[in-house]
Amino acid sequence: MANALLARTNRDADRSPDFKIPVKALLTLCNAAFRRHGAGEFAQAIRIYEQILAIRPDLSDIHNNLGHALAALGRPAAAVTAFAHAIELRPSYPEALCNWGLALAELDRLDEAEAKYRQAIEVAPRFAGAYNNLGLLLKATGRLTEAKRAFKQAIALAPNDFSIYHNLAAVRPFSAGDRYLTALEAAAADPSMLPATDQMHLHFTLAKANDDLDRSEYAFAHLMKANWLKRRQIAYDEADTLGRMNRLRELVSHDFIRARQGCGERSAVPVFIVGMTRSGTTLIEQILASHPHVFGAGEHPLLDQVTGSIQKLLPGAPTFPDMMLHMSGADFCALGSLYLDSLMERSATALRITDKMTLNFLFVGLIHLALPDAAIIHAVRDPADTCLSSFSTHFSNGNEHTYDLAELGRYYRHYRQLMAHWHDVLPPGRILDVHYEDVVADVEKAARRIISHCGLDWDPRCLDFHLTERTVKTASAAQVRKPIYKNSIARWRKYEAFIGPLLAELAPIAE
């Protein structure tokens, strides 16, 4: 990559004498940046990219790479600036246009993001990635028919990119004789030539297709292959993950809470929706976001980020949860204030703003102390249904515990033990449990409980949640565009014969 980059940019240098530097020195910097970037060392890569640009600000590829690294570090606003520089230098640069769109989408500037994807298609009509990104945005905004069309166009241009088939599968069911299913089955007949990631997407998609066709045995065989392939690609420290949950139960006692109460930021704006993935959190947020005084902010790691900011200020920078032992009342208040400032950047006018980062169940004790007036809603669903749905999903990031049945069961058990602990040590009524099955059985009754818990007056628009136009970036993006349906309840039963390791781990908490 570095040699190709320099071949292009040094032609420009011949016309711009001020930019001439020894090629070898620039090549060394570029290679160092690319190595860091490829290894996921984004902060180090950014520093080198900035060095390069200080010498050669005319390199559009380096601006693009800088933007990519900034976005990977959770700095989409800075990434937007970098991509804008890349396009200023090279207007017909489809990859940078797509990356620009992704960063804009992360900032919820969706109209602008869509425009960048369409601009990328205009300058490169055969760029499958642009159609795929456009499809994902259309799916997130509920324009499912348009999303299908975009994914189909992407597949026509890149028929061997099985991640696109996976995206298409999320917005349409498969049927017998489906031409896309035929293509997938042909690829699965001899997957040995495919990279592991392509095989993984292929098997996740075939699992969905066979589930659509009620071929449970075939579906689960593909699901096992997909998860096995994914599990081999990731690092998951189970002892550390479960140990943190155990440490929270040990550390945050009744006495711990009592000694620190009354010192947080007083605001009722935040509404935390916590729980396991695939437990109904998106449905709860969609109901809330249909209320005129609520803004649904979706999943953002805001609480984790501000907790990290406070941690760095404490003597010795102790990690969570032990950092809570070293926090003063002022620290809890500062954490709550920092979080509130970040949250309200999403909406300055809403009376309530939801935070649907499911992993915030780890922070419930911290939330209570730092934001004592914030609502906390816990989404609960049948354990086996929750876990099977997670096992059936390929997550774009995180959720490393979901790719092995036994690990998933152990994680779920520890999560439920921690939630029971929060109920025990916090004041009665502090956490509202909302069971998915209860929402399905009587959506109005459940919705009224949710709205009341958030201190809002009832609004009938909450019952038409499937009509609410907003962005949903989770795996449930297509489902929440439909009215309530019941076919996800007890879905695990048709896979009971295959999920023994999961059921064995769940047995101690069987309901």
Model-derived segments and their meaning:
Residues 29-32, 36, 48, 62-76, ...:
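TPR/Sel1-like alpha-solenoid repeat signature
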Residues 150, 165-169, 181-193, 202-270, ...:
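PAPS-dependent sulfotransferases, especially Golgi type II membrane carbohydrate sulfotransferases
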